[in-house]
């Protein structure tokens, strides 16, 4: 039963990743065409362009790895499997850092906090976006290299099977690997949740203020604010389970977990990228308009 559930989770993840590939290819092409036509691109679209490319490569790599894994006629190589994992880890980390940067940009640009730090960021963050994107890539490369180093230095935990369950013999090296993974994920998690929460709070307060002062409450500006607030709420719903599931998947003793736990982690980890990409498209005016034209919908 658990094997069937795990196999169903793999099929669902393949379908979701295929959808994610199409969505991110769409985001990349639309932003690229805008960039070529106008010879300039906004800070948020620059991040979306980088995010679309990274997720397209990451999800494509996942599909290739899945086909390689389930193929019975292919001789599996340990080194090739490790290469897949490390490349996926680097691309996944880069995409999350790009999303983190995008959330920071939205938080700084949209919120009306008068703190000196917010005012300083509001004035200076847009020109720094190219450098910040490069910093995201370098941080992801560093964390991936750190994972490789600690994995090589730390032997994987030995499985000790008892009558009722399976326990692990965890060394100090394994603990250092786990601590490094938790610390690297925690920084992204704290920044994302904080920026999204601040933006939701600011937008909710702004909408309440408009509702009290305006005679006609529902207008295009209010609709845009509500859309941004919904995007952040749905982002948190997708991001928080994804962060936990991804962290569990990278832990050394993940291989010894039961099929049910692996299936749940796989579904949550896979749902985030395609789901967030769809949210970006339906809340971004230019992407939404282009998508409607492609689908032959009229306004």
UniProtKB/Swiss-Prot annotation:
Membrane topology label: Multi-pass membrane protein
GO CC annotation terms, alphabetical: ciliary membrane; membrane; plasma membrane
Record's subcellular location: Membrane; Cell projection, Cilium membrane
Transmembrane feature ranges: 10-30, 47-67, 82-102, 132-152, 173-193, 231-251, 263-283
Domain of life where this protein originates: Eukaryota
Tissues expressed in: Expressed in subsets of taste receptor cells of the tongue and palate epithelium and exclusively in gustducin-positive cells. Expressed on airway ciliated epithelium.
Disulfide links within the chain: none
Keyword Hydrolase: no
Main location: membrane
Gene Ontology molecular function: bitter taste receptor activity; G protein-coupled receptor activity; taste receptor activity
Glycan-carrying positions: 164-165, 169
GO biological process, one term: respiratory gaseous exchange by respiratory system
Its job: Gustducin-coupled receptor for denatonium and N(6)-propyl-2-thiouracil implicated in the perception of bitter compounds in the oral cavity and the gastrointestinal tract. Signals through PLCB2 and the calcium-regulated cation channel TRPM5. In airway epithelial cells, binding of denatonium increases the intracellular calcium ion concentration and stimulates ciliary beat frequency.
Family membership noted in the UniProt record: Belongs to the G-protein coupled receptor T2R family.
Additional note from the record: Several bitter taste receptors are expressed in a single taste receptor cell.
Name recorded for this polypeptide: Taste receptor type 2 member 4
Organism: Homo sapiens (Human)
Gene designation per UniProt: TAS2R4
């Amino acid at each position: 039963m658990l094997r069937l559930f795990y196999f169903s989770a793999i099929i669902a993840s393949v379908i979701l990743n295929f959808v994610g590939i199409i969505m991110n290819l769409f985001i990349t092409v639309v932003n690229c065409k805008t960039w070529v036509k106008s010879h300039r691109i906004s800070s948020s679209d620059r991040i979306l362009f980088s995010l679309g490319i990274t997720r397209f490569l990451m999800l494509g790599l996942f599909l290739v790895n899945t086909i390689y894994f389930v193929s019975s006629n292919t001789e599996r190589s340990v080194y090739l499997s490790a290469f897949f994992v490390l490349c996926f880890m680097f691309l996944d980390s880069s995409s999350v850092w790009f999303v983190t940067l995008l959330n920071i940009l939205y938080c700084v640009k949209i919120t009306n906090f008068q703190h000196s730090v917010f005012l300083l960021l509001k004035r200076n963050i847009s020109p720094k976006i190219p450098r910040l994107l490069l910093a995201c890539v370098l941080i992801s490369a560093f964390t991936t290299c750190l994972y490789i180093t600690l994995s090589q230095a730390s032997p994987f935990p030995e499985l000790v099977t008892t009558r009722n369950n399976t326990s692990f013999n965890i060394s100090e090296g394994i603990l250092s690997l786990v601590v490094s993974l938790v610390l690297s994920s925690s920084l992204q998690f704290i920044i994302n949740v904080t920026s999204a929460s601040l933006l939701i709070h600011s937008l909710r307060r702004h909408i309440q203020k408009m509702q009290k002062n305006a005679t006609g409450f529902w207008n295009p500006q209010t609709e845009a604010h509500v859309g941004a607030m919904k995007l952040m709420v749905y982002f948190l719903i997708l991001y928080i389970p994804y962060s936990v599931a991804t962290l569990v998947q990278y832990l050394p003793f993940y291989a010894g977990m039961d099929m049910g736990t692996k299936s749940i982690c796989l579904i949550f980890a896979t749902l985030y990228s395609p789901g967030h990409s769809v949210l970006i498209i339906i809340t971004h005016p230019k992407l939404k308009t282009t998508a409607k034209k492609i689908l032959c919908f009229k306004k």
